Amino acid sequence: MLSLTATLCIVGVGLVIVVGGILGFRLHAFLALVLAAIVVSLLTPNSTVEWYQLGKQQIPVLSQQEGTATLDLKSSPSHQIGQQFLLAKQVDATGNVETVATATLSGFDDNEHAIVDIMPVEGSTGVEWDKSIVVTPQAREDATAFANQTVGNLVAGGFGATCTGIGILIALAAIIGKCLLDSGAAEKIVRWMLSIVGEKNAPLSFIFSGFALSTPVFFDTVFYLMIPIGKAMRLRTGKNYLLYIMTIVMGGTMAHSLVPPTPGPLFVAEELGVDVGVMILAGGLVGLSCAMVGFLYSIILCRFADIPLRESPEMSLDELQQIANREDSELPSIWMSLMPIILPVLLITGATVMNTMLKGVPQAEISPVMKAVDQFFVLFGNKNIAMAISATLAIIMLVRQKKSDLSDLANSLQAALASGGVIILITAAGGAFGKSLQQTGIANLFGDVAGASTTMILVIAFVVTSLVRLAQGSATVSMITGVGVMASFAAGVDLGFHPVYLALAIGCGSKMFLWMNDSGFWVIGKMSGMTEWETLKYVTPMTSLMGAFGLLVTIVAANLLPLV
């Protein structure tokens, strides 16, 4: 078994490669993450990887006595009297994994737990229950084969597993986002929000519009879209420009880190085994509560501060006037504009609700109507199917609105997939890096935390993600790295609360310390006309406040409503 010092050193090398590669050598995040995954896998002994794989497949030991033990086999009919299991442990001196005993199934107790007879293997170092785990012979064979793969195959396996979970979703989200922008649907949503709340309450419309648009559209793109509208509002009202900027940021940035199918929260949910529908609901509630705190902060701040509307390189004030005066007839209807955003949310969350309602209910007690509804959501509530339907609707809307030919449509889709492809590469590379971190046995670093409070576990996840964000800038990369550190720990212990809270703590941690190493910092500053000092002075404290408040909400919810 690797010592804690050795594990820390290997993990530290990986983190240094990611942070140093991105900041020091200006490597693309994809290259930095893949390189880090390769180096960490090279430094991790095969025996450590094998032990990690065995740990994922171990059978819970409920009790043990001299010569016997009781196992939790979940009363599976596949287990028969006479079936053999293995007791394995890592030898302290060498780190190698050895089989120290066999366990033969001899019967079941009154609670249908398996009783096994223990027979030590001659010549082994002996059974030590606090260091040994029980596995099937097949699991031992599979773990050995997995650990003996080449480094290239190990990294590619982590990369491919991540692509399987989220690759299609990100590509479809990119298509939806591009169609919303090119068709004018995104602008229509913002104008509709403004018409509901009125120009006096324009900041609120910016919050909710930014939040809604940032689920299928990446934050930088949402800011590009909405800041001209914010500038146009400043031309109309003659005041509150700083408030407009900050409200555009707060809605978009919280959805960016908390609500799938945005890549960061989508990846975190997949790694922690959180249902996407649950993540959408929980992320939406926490994200909007954080945005409201950011709004209160901005209202107070803007009583004492404002900034002038300045010319910016990408758009003159005359062009702003043209945007402000654009006719509504040039834009799609509001229901068509909202459909690609709302439909997948309804389908995915509907599937989650049905699964929760019918969980544990015997089939004979479910009415035919409920069975039909359940089958509908099983098919159309699948995250990939729901997003594919939404992408189809978005494409149809773009074609109808622009009346473009197939070549123009192909160009739009090509641009969307090019953008989404880069995100898929970065996220999948992050998945490979995360898997390599987990295989070092990093969960052992948190051994003393297993019995710690809910608050302590969530704070650790938040702090780890925050420090990575501070070091390298990207919220998405910090979430990928943070969940890579925490996922194996979360899988190995009883958290005492639903893992969605761990995902939320990681997402909130990615909101801390916005500064000059983040591309979003420069997008906000340059597009709005703010100086670097103004961005640091006004925007950075707000995003950090929202992240910290999100952690507080998550801690309170996990303690009061653990959902387990």
Specify the residue positions occupied by each region the protein language model found.
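Hydrophobic alpha-helical transmembrane segments of multi-pass integral membrane proteins
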Residues: 167-173, 196-229, 424-432, 453-489, ...
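Alpha-helical transmembrane segments of multi-pass membrane proteins
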Residues: 199-215, 237-257, 277-284, 288, ...
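Intrinsically disordered, low-complexity non-transmembrane regions of multi-pass membrane transporters
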Residues: 1, 49-146, 303-335, 360-373, ...
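Membrane-interfacial loop-to-helix junctions in multi-pass transporters
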Residues: 5-9, 160-167, 193-207, 236-244, ...
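Core transmembrane alpha-helical segments of multi-pass membrane transporters/permeases
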Residues: 74-77, 82-89, 133-187, 211, ...
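Membrane-core helix-loop-helix motifs of multi-pass transport proteins
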Residues: 231-345, 520-557
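Long, contiguous bundles of hydrophobic transmembrane helices that form the permeation core
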Residues: 2-8, 57, 67-69, 281-411, ...
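Hydrophobic mid-bilayer segments of alpha-helices in multi-pass membrane transport proteins
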Residues: 8-19, 26-48, 128-136, 167-174, ...
